[in-house]
From Swiss-Prot:
Pfam families: Ribosomal_L28 (PF00830)
Protein name as it appears in the record: Large ribosomal subunit protein bL28
GO annotations of cellular component type: ribonucleoprotein complex; ribosome
Top-level lineage group: Bacteria
Biased segments, Basic residues type: 10-27
Region of interest (Disordered), ranges: 1-27
GO MF term (any one): structural constituent of ribosome
Family statement: Belongs to the bacterial ribosomal protein bL28 family.
PANTHER family linked to this entry: 50S RIBOSOMAL PROTEIN L28, LARGE RIBOSOMAL SUBUNIT PROTEIN BL28A
Organism: Shouchella clausii (strain KSM-K16)
Keywords for the protein's UniProt record, in alphabetical order: Ribonucleoprotein, Ribosomal protein
Gene Ontology BP, a term: translation
């Protein structure tokens, strides 16, 4: 469960890398997750949180 948002559950997705000739090969699109300290059950904990959750105010840093 590494590199997954603790709040929203956002994580890496798979897709295709396309060359100029439109050949395809598999690749991963990583989620923009940051390691931050937040309060979990009243105690500070270091977890991965997506940038979208941080910007929208769904979580408060400690």
């Amino acid at each position: 469960m590494a590199r997954e948002c603790y709040i929203t559950g956002r994580k890496a997705r798979s897709g295709n890398k396309r060359s100029h000739a439109m050949n395809k090969s598999k690749r991963r699109f990583g989620a923009n997750v940051q390691k931050v300290r937040i309060l979990v059950d009243g105690k500070p904990k270091r977890v991965y949180v997506s940038a979208r959750a941080l910007k929208s105010g769904k979580v408060e840093r400690v």
